[in-house]
Amino acid sequence: MKHIIYIFLLCSIFSFAQVRVVKELDSNWKFQKRKSLEAYQINFNDANWEKVNVPHDWAIYGPFDKEIDKQNVAIVQNGEEVASEKTGRTGALPHIGSAWYRNNFNIPEYETGKKVILLFEGAMSEPKVYLNGKKVGEWAYGYSYFYFDISKDIKEGENSLAVEVSNP
């Protein structure tokens, strides 16, 4: 009988367990390669922006050019005393500057008080993240995962996510 009560109690505990819900935001993104001071705003017009799915690496669009990151230096650690041409420091990425990603998504049912985490598996680089017009965080790196607690900023219904990235 003790075993039956124990199993019943375990079943009761598991029935109250929280259910984790995952919403992937890998499609329906809009993208623009340019600096914009207003792109984080909820009603920003992104109708003419390129449609992309993520993962998407904005910095590799266009031809690679070694002139972008060419240097004439002597690398002391390599024992060099005479300067010579070096390339590849940044991989000769074809775009230097800023770009934006935007995604409008729907949360059909949301209970206030639930914990909501926005997880990025990487964003190159120095992303600034906005949800519903409010900056929710930034990350100083590139191809590494990061996350923000957006529990206070998410809402039931339509939400607007904007991410500014830069390749300085």
Where in the sequence are the language-model features?
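General helical structural elements
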Residues: 6, 14, 74-76, 93
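Bacterial Sec-dependent N-terminal signal peptides
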Residues: 1-20
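Accessory beta-strand-rich segments of carbohydrate-active enzymes
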Residues: 21-25, 30-35, 91-168
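Accessory carbohydrate-binding/adhesion or oligomerization-edge regions at the termini
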Residues: 17-82, 136, 160-168
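Short glycine/threonine/proline-enriched tight-turn/helix- or strand-capping micro-motif at secondary-structure
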Residues: 83-88
